[in-house]
């Protein structure tokens, strides 16, 4: 996976759409792209409220010849709980909170503890996602302990 990375806090979350705009303007330059989905990766989320890194990215076959600002991110093979979302993209943070506060305790599952630099949560935007309406094919992938 490769893409643009920036750090966010609760106060700066509203800047994420600007990162997506930059990403969309550059993704056509990535010749090693695999598939049609776009991804939002939430990385190094801390319970202490220090924010998290967010990567707007795509799957790639290799990390060569990427735009200068882009970084590579390793996505480990592991078990994921996958949640489909049919609402507007702006409600994803509410869905993520419901997963953490309701689904996890009720399911008896535990979130995996990713290594530094690996995602705590993955947003997957499929072919049917329409960035103009903010709706369509959206999934949230939560790494969980097997």
Go through each PLM region and give its residues.
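A solvent-exposed interaction/effector surface
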Residues: 1-146
């Amino acid at each position: 996976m490769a893409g643009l990375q920036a750090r966010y806090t609760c106060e700066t979350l509203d800047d994420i759409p600007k990162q997506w705009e930059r990403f969309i303007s550059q993704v056509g330059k990535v010749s090693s792209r695999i598939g049609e989905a776009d991804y939002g990766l939430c990385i190094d989320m801390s319970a202490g409220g220090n924010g998290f890194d967010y990567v707007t990215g795509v799957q790639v076959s290799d990390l060569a010849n990427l735009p200068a600002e882009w970084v590579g991110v390793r996505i480990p093979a592991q078990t994921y709980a996958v949640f489909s979302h049919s609402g507007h993209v702006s409600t994803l943070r509410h869905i993520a909170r419901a997963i953490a506060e309701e689904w996890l305790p009720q399911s008896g599952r535990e979130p995996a503890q990713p290594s530094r630099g690996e995602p705590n949560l993955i947003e997957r935007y499929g072919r049917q996602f329409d960035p103009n309406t903010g709706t369509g094919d959206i999934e949230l992938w939560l790494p969980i302990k097997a």
